[in-house]
Amino acid sequence: MADDRVAGGATPPPPPPPPPLDASAFTHTPYYCEENVHLLCKELIRSGISDPAGTNLYAVFISNEEKKVPLWYQKASHSGDGFVLWDYHVICIQSRRKNGEVLDLVWDLDSSLPFPCSFIQYVSDAIRPLSFGNSTYRRLFRVIHAPVFLRSFASDRSHMKDHAGNWIQLPPKYESIVAEDGTTNNLNEYITMSMDDVKDLESMADDVYSSKHGVVINETILPEFFSRLPG
């Protein structure tokens, strides 16, 4: 029997996100989220979850001027709501479209939300936009197209050593990531961001595909920005 809502011209509900995957099957080193996302993008491409060139994937660095980034539903939290105040965090967003419907996914190996999680749910539950207004805790998002990120990002992990050269957090067991041009460390270029970096939506939707460091957007325009990207 036909659904009267659809037959009458009403818009059917969007399809649900794909069933959750086992996050433990992906490489994850605590406190090295930038490297986790680098390897995650590669694995999503290799496994066919993304398109072969990774053109529907985006690495997203979350930080602000004060390096105080509130997020919820984080596994590292000791509170019931999963609250953590990071200096920065990195996630992967996959742009998906079906019949004009925006069905974006968020891949966050450090989140207790479904893996992957629908973009709408992640924004609502983990980011909670407008929670802090114009305070120092408002989040900024540096969005880098995955093909550019995989070529350009590098980290020698020096940010995880104290002044005596001791590890603050143990590093991954694999070799550090070196950019295609031989750069060995540019992490700070990705996590440093300010409101002055935020430009108009139209130009950012174009620049994200060519800029080595992507584009910086604020939390109020985050959903609209991704709605403008192709799937």
UniProtKB/Swiss-Prot annotation:
It comes from the Eukaryota. The active site is at C33, H89, D108. Residues 11-21 have a biased composition (Pro residues). Transmembrane segments: none annotated. GO terms for cellular component: cytosol; nucleus. Gene3D superfamilies: Protein N-terminal glutamine amidohydrolase, alpha beta roll (3.10.620.10). It catalyses: N-terminal L-glutaminyl-[protein] + H2O = N-terminal L-glutamyl-[protein] + NH4(+). One of its GO terms (molecular function) is protein-N-terminal asparagine amidohydrolase activity. One of its GO terms (biological process) is defense response to bacterium. Its EC number is 3.5.1.122. Residues 1-21 are annotated as: Disordered. Belongs to the NTAQ1 family. Monomer. PANTHER family: PROTEIN N-TERMINAL GLUTAMINE AMIDOHYDROLASE. This is Protein N-terminal glutamine amidohydrolase. It comes from Oryza sativa subsp. japonica (Rice).
